[in-house]
Swiss-Prot record:
Keywords: Disulfide bond, Glycoprotein, Host endosome, Host Golgi apparatus, Host membrane, Host nucleus, Membrane, Transmembrane, Transmembrane helix, Viral envelope protein, Virion. The chain crosses the membrane at residues 13-33, 77-97, 118-140, 148-168, 200-220, 237-257, 264-284, 294-314. Residues 34-76, 141-147, 221-236, 285-293 are virion surface. GO terms for cellular component: host cell endosome membrane; host cell Golgi apparatus; host cell nuclear inner membrane; membrane; viral envelope; virion membrane. Envelope glycoprotein important for virion assembly and egress. Plays a role in the correct incorporation of gH-gL into virion membrane. Directs the glycoprotein N (gN) to the host trans-Golgi network. This is Envelope glycoprotein M. The gene is gM. The keyword Glycoprotein applies. Its main location: virion. Pfam families: Herpes_glycop (PF01528). Belongs to the herpesviridae glycoprotein M family. Residues 1-12, 98-117, 169-199, 258-263, 315-346 are intravirion. It is found in: Virion membrane; Host Golgi apparatus, Host trans-Golgi network; Host endosome membrane; Host nucleus inner membrane.
Length: 346
């Protein structure tokens, strides 16, 4: 059966969206590579947003325009940027593989089969959200290079919103779990192999989201701490608490809603754990420099986040290995059995 007009239009839009995503990725990658080299148009090294070695607290207004708040050290920030770019590449490969499989799949008698397949794998809306995610991430790195911490906090907030929307779209396809399961059962037989690939991609996206929630917390507090007269220790404490609230809310959403769509979802929890590990070292360096009186509170809060995250992991493991057993009864086959069933219902 030939493709319907709806299939033709949706496939053309989808292909154009993937091409746009490819061009955006090339632009972002070239930008992220160039930002690591001097004399290429970027005034400062983005990863040295807080140069703790240059701080001399015995001199008044040593930093002037930038207060040394809690933030990632240069090596951590470089690794984070490279890691995100690699993950963007794998997401792009996923779209390309799905596109090739849809075009190479044999025609079926089902109406709008290609549209149904595209919707489940990741349609034009998710691809557009992916483009916005990469663009806002590029703006964030550029703002760090120009030492515009307030604008960097704003752009990272936009990035995090776009990335959260992209994650939800990839998991739910903005449908109910029943509808998503129904579409999954009716995708093209040749696309069955992409189910495992999509599960891996979703967990990788959640891993990025879990770690990015930590970066979001300290970036927002970095912007606030450099625009208002707030103690640095208060800003650091607020960063940890913000990370705790976000990790708790996101993990709770998975256990209450999103687990109905994808059963294997451990990426967010491991991303939060990596975020805890990534935040521990800057806190130790920060505490050794400023000798804050909130050291115990910092450690206690990190311990609480770790315990809560491990609790959600245990809960996810239990629900993953737990099987629902239904006791089926034999259907009535005789008139006597039907009479007994009617009497029981009465």
């Amino acid at each position: 059966m030939a493709l319907s007009r709806v299939d033709v239009i949706n496939m053309r839009i989808w292909v154009l969206s993937i091409i746009c995503a490819c061009l955006t990725y090339v632009n972002v990658t070239v930008h992220l590579v160039a930002v690591h080299f001097p004399n290429l148009g970027f005034p400062c090294a983005y990863y040295e947003i807080n140069d703790m070695k240059a701080i001399n607290l015995s001199i008044r207004n040593d930093i002037r325009s930038l207060t040394p708040q809690l933030y990632l050290n240069p090596i951590q920030l470089i690794c984070y940027v490279v890691f995100m770019d690699i993950c963007f590449f794998f997401i792009l490969v996923y779209y390309i593989v799905c596109c090739v499989k849809v075009f190479s799949s044999e025609k079926t008698p089902n109406i709008n089969q290609s549209t149904r397949d595209i919707t489940w794998m990741g349609d034009s809306l998710s691809c557009f959200q992916f483009v916005l995610t990469m663009d806002t991430y590029q703006f964030f790195v550029t703002c760090l290079s120009f030492r515009l911490v307030t604008l960097a906090a704003f752009t990272y907030c936009l990035f995090f919103i776009c990335f959260t929307a992209f994650t939800l779209t990839m998991i739910t396809q903005y449908q109910s779990s029943e509808r998503s399961f129904f579409v999954l059962k009716r995708i093209h037989p040749k696309l069955k192999g992409t189910i495992k690939y999509k599960t891996i991609i979703i967990n990788m996206i959640e891993l990025m989201l879990g770690f990015s929630s930590m970066v979001f917390a300290i970036t927002i507090c970095l912007g606030l701490g450099n625009n208002f007269y707030i103690k640095s220790s208060t800003v650091a404490f607020a960063s940890i608490n913000t990370f705790f609230v976000m990790s708790f809310v996101y993990s709770l959403v998975i256990e209450l809603i999103l687990h109905q769509y994808v059963k294997v979802q451990f990426g967010l929890h491991f991303g939060i754990l990596f975020g805890i590990l990534g935040l521990t070292y800057p806190i130790l360096k920060y505490d050794s420099l400023f000798k804050t009186e909130w050291t115990v509170k910092f450690i206690v809060n990190l311990a609480v986040i770790t315990i809560v995250c491990l609790s959600f992991i245990i809960c996810r493991l239990i629900r993953f290995f737990m099987r629902k057993h239904h006791n089926y009864k034999k259907l009535p086959t005789t008139v006597e059995d039907l009479d007994v069933l009617e009497e029981a219902n009465e």
